[in-house]
């Protein structure tokens, strides 16, 4: 298992600065955020460390060589939109960019794209499963033809009132995953234990059942404020009663989680996803949070 970093937390860094910092900190890999250049639609989105819309083969070779010179692997090309958005233009733009990422990932020899499945928040799960098959069948045909794995993060994307009532990502439960995996052998999970923890689910059980579909891993923690949960209730906006935290500062049992990853012989990349407002006051705060997270997770990975 290789410990890495999700690049979204360092939006002001160039690709070179990002890879240099990752190497200095002791990371073995980085998930590179590849959003289209433009205004961010939410926190930690809209980050572009590789602009695939302005990249030729020479530029691809440059990125690969620079990463190699740093001794840091590019674990995947990451982009987390809603390709099943109820607005057709928004959905189509997301789908098209995912396909571009698949093509770039194949050409660069990365063969991994990390993203969201998407969801129409106003439709039922069953209706969304039908929509998923319609939208994702052609996308996965491209991925299969190019030998690229697509790792879907298991985040419900249901935190605030603008994501109400159903959330913006369908792929948050085993019930959905079983049907999702029927579509393609190249479709798997970018598994983050903080999401099932938030949903009150067992965080390690899915690793054993879906061991062959754990393509990529995120390390992120969650802190639940019980007083606020008592006030608002479980069916309120989750942002009212929980906070994303650095690994080790919330409720996720990372010793047990990494132990389960070892049990299933997971040998891929596991990237720390730093999302913690307590460590975002300045770039020094951000770096401190990253480095603390690296030290904390290294004790479990033997780095």
Feature names for model-found ranges:
Residues 1-29, 34-36, 68, 109, ...:
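Histidine-acidic metal/acid-base catalytic patches
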Residues 2-5, 47-49, 85-87, 123-125, ...:
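A short, structure-level motif marking secondary-structure boundaries and short turns
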Residues 11, 56, 94, 132, ...:
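Charged, low-complexity surface patches
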Residues 17, 61-73, 83-191, 198-199, ...:
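Active-site acidic/histidine proton-transfer and metal-coordination neighborhood
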Residues 28-34, 73-78, 111-115:
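Short, well-structured secondary-structure segments
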Residues 33-62, 123:
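Glycine-rich, proline-tolerant flexible connector loops at the mouths of alpha/beta enzymes
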Residues 37-38, 81-82, 120-121, 158, ...:
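Positions that flank functional sites
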């Amino acid at each position: 298992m290789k410990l890495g970093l999700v690049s979204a937390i360092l939006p002001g860094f160039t690709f070179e600065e990002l890879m240099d910092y990752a190497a200095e900190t002791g990371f073995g890999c980085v998930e590179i955020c590849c959003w289209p250049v433009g205004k961010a639609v939410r926190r930690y989105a809209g980050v572009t460390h590789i602009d695939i819309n302005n990249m030729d083969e020479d530029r691809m070779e440059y990125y690969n060589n620079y990463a190699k010179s740093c001794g840091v692997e590019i674990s995947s090309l990451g982009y987390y939109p809603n390709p099943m958005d109820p607005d057709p233009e928004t959905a189509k733009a997301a789908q098209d960019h995912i396909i571009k990422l698949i093509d770039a990932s194949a050409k660069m020899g990365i063969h991994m794209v990390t993203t969201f499945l998407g969801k129409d928040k106003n439709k039922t799960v069953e209706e969304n499963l039908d929509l998923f098959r319609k939208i994702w069948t052609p996308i996965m045909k491209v991925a299969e033809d190019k030998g690229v794995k697509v790792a879907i993060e298991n985040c419900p994307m249901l935190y605030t009132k603008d994501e109400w009532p159903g959330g913006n990502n369908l792929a948050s439960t085993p019930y959905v995953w079983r049907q999702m995996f029927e579509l393609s052998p190249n479709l798997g999970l970018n598994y983050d234990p903080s999401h099932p923890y938030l949903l009150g689910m067992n965080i390690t059980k899915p690793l054993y059942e879906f061991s062959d579909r754990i393509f990529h891993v995120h390390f992120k923690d969650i802190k639940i404020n019980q007083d606020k949960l008592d006030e608002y209730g479980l069916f309120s906006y989750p942002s009212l009663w929980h906070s994303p935290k650095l690994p080790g500062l919330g409720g996720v049992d990372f010793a047990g989680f990494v132990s389960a990853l070892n049990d299933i012989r997971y040998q891929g990349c596991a990237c720390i996803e730093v999302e913690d407002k307590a460590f975002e006051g300045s770039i020094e705060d951000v770096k401190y949070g990253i480095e603390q997270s690296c030290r904390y997770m290294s004790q479990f990975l033997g780095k």
